Amino acid sequence: MTAMMITGMCAADVSAAEKKAVTDYQAYAANLDKSAYSGNDLGASYSKKATTFKVWSPNAASVRVNIFEHGSDNEGDAGSIMSRAMSLDKTTGVWSVTINGDLLNKYYTYSVTHGKTTKETADVYAKACGVNGQRSMVVDLSTTNPEGWKNDKHVLVQNQTDASVWEISVADFSSSESSGVSEANRGKYLAFTEEGTTVNGVQGASSTCVDYLKKLGVKYVQIMPFYDFGSVDESKNIMDQYNWGYDPVNYNCPEGSYSTNPKKGEVRIKECKQMIQALHNAGIGVIMDVVYNHTYTSDSWFQRTVPNYYYRMNNDGTFSNGSGCSNDTASEHLMFRKYMIDSVTYWASEYHIDGFRFDLMGLHDVTTMNSIRTALDNLYADGSGSQILMYGEAWDMATNCDEGTVLASQKNLKQLSDRIGAFDDTIRDAIKGSTGGTDCAFVQEGSRRANLKTGIAGQSDTTTGWANVPSQCVTYASCHDNLCLYDKLVGSVYGADGKYRKRYEDLVAMNKLSAAIVITSQGIP
């Protein structure tokens, strides 16, 4: 998401009038933190003989689990198969029930009652879900592994600065007929499994898709969100809809619109793994774009499960909105911190994800980000988890976090592990100017040299840089936000007379110079 360089409100940044010792909401969250659960068994734990359901909701009056044959009301006999009351362990705040029998691929929700209000919710810890993510699914993950998955390995680099990253979207990667991908797989996970694709499918034409990436020589692809998101109706054709996916619904389930059958929760899991496997077979690592800083709606599964706990709340009862997406999550609250750690390590271990790009990382706190780093470091006995990449958008943003919280923004980056990086907007703008305006910079007119030098050195200058070491600096000229590099050059050099579909040789040269700066700078290109 776009950088919004605004002053934060946490810790020392708040005004005296805003420094209320503890708000009612912060006291409420702190009290719930006393019941924080450390177990690793939240969600549905499946066996052929029985399935145990566990959900953390210490202040709920009652919780029931509802079992369904299908993932939505629009499929066959959509009525509930059964509903069972769950029991509360007051020492852990966890509600649980074990249901005998084989519930494989059955769907479920929870009915959670707070006071006199009961809301139905999916499971925040669900690892599989039905169409549009409205119901969770009981899954045996071992049945979702593609052939050869046991032999699939992480693609890692010894040093972070050895990485080279190319950003892609699952849909954009192959949605055009010109991609040469079969019609059935265009815009889907399985497009990555097709080999020998060329422009328009013409023999001898330029390579496309994974074959193109191999020729490009990149070490990693940073894939825009492919967890389950809410802005696309999975029951409809993906080619008729479009969204990047920065609107999370189910963090631990793959997005269904990218699968060949979004109504079957197990299908999206297997096909997502096939995508990752195909990239690994090509020698390319996968960096997952994760968006833990907000959810698609404020009436999320988190809010329905434990109201006003998982989010930063203003004193008037509204949601903090530093993200610009209407609800900032509260990474400083122990159970959302745990959730982020559990979610990242789950994707790394189950899906063999090789790196994580944290959207609006500056909204998360330093302790949580360092804890995620430690959890990844300890993920494997051979220590290879320490090579899983971590970086994010460390913009300084206004959010109403608990007093004393230190946010993972650029100004606090030196408090993060040296193996947590941040995007360098300074060199980005020094190369070609601001992301959307018509202003010029180094490649157009030779200006902004001081900022460029700092960026080339990986922001590690002791007086002006914000990084401990160059490996914390992600060097780039453009990304999915705002104008692409060439369009920026057209607008800044030729203004209103510029033709965006025309090839200007001087702009091509500027584009090449931009790439040369990124590739030869210290840091992660």
Q: Which residues are covered by each model-predicted region?
A:
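Substrate-binding/active-site clefts of carbohydrate-active enzymes
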Residues: 171-351, 360-361, 365-381, 401
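Beta-strand signatures of extracellular beta-sandwich domains
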Residues: 64-66, 111
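Hydrophobic faces of well-ordered beta-strands that scaffold small-molecule active sites
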Residues: 164-166, 221-223, 286-288, 356, ...
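Conserved alpha/beta catalytic core and glycan-binding cleft of carbohydrate-active enzymes
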Residues: 139, 373-376, 385-525
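Sec-dependent signal peptide cleavage junction
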Residues: 6-21
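Structural beta-strand segments of beta-rich domains
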Residues: 49-53
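The feature marks proteins involved in alpha-glucan
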Residues: 18-48, 81, 89-196
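Short proline/glycine-enriched turn/loop motifs at strand-loop junctions of beta-rich domains
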Residues: 56-62, 481
